[in-house]
Design a protein with these regions (language model features):
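An anion/phosphate-binding loop that grips the pyrophosphate of nucleotide cofactors and donors
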Residues: 2
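P-loop NTPase catalytic nucleotide-binding module
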Residues: 10-180
Length: 180
């Protein structure tokens, strides 16, 4: 029995031919999925590019639920758009320890934009949440977002996109938490 898939994409190479083949198989068998963009610490990595490729090349509704903090060798954390906070990994522990902090000042506007897009997208799959979104977007809770997101993923309407670096254990625990 297969309940769901984690699709792994390279932050440098993006969607590759084998990704397309496996994606079509998952579509045929109606398997819900989540995307993990790996190798964010590599030169030439680009989370946004990969998310756009997943949308365009695979015809999916890829929705970012995180934003990267730092690029390439300076990749050090993520902004969790659901909880509206940042996670910064400790280099010396190879990502096994981290700090939860406020969103860095230079990412606040971008985080607000992408959180709004995330809420708008999941609200379109939940009538109660859509009504609340129209009245007061700020009053929507983490639990409401998670519930609507889960329903949309199970209906294969949304593909949540996460980024990290598996080699350095950055984003792996976040991915595991997202799957559960």
């Amino acid at each position: 029995v297969l309940d769901g898939l984690v699709f792994l994409f390279s932050a440098v190479d993006g969607v590759e031919p084998q990704s397309e083949t496996n994606w079509r198989l998952a579509d045929n068998y109606k398997v819900p999925r989540i995307g993990f963009v790996n190798k964010m610490d590599r030169q030439g990595s680009n989370f946004q590019m990969v998310c756009n490729q997943v949308k365009e090349m695979l015809g999916s509704n890829a929705v970012q639920i995180v934003l990267p903090i730092g690029e390439e060798a300076d990749f050090k954390g993520i902004v969790d758009l659901i909880k509206n906070r940042a996670i910064i990994w400790h280099e010396e522990s190879m990502g096994s320890t981290f700090d939860i902090v406020d969103i860095p000042e230079n990412l606040k506007e971008e985080a607000k934009k992408y959180r709004g897009l995330l809420i708008e997208e999941v609200a379109s799959y939940d009538d109660n949440l859509l009504e609340k979104y129209m009245e007061d977007e700020e009053s929507i809770t983490e639990e409401e977002i998670n519930s609507a997101l889960r329903a949309a993923v199970m209906d294969m309407a949304i593909i949540p996109m996460i980024c990290g670096s598996a080699f350095k254990n950055k984003g792996v625990q976040f991915l595991l938490d997202a799957v559960c």
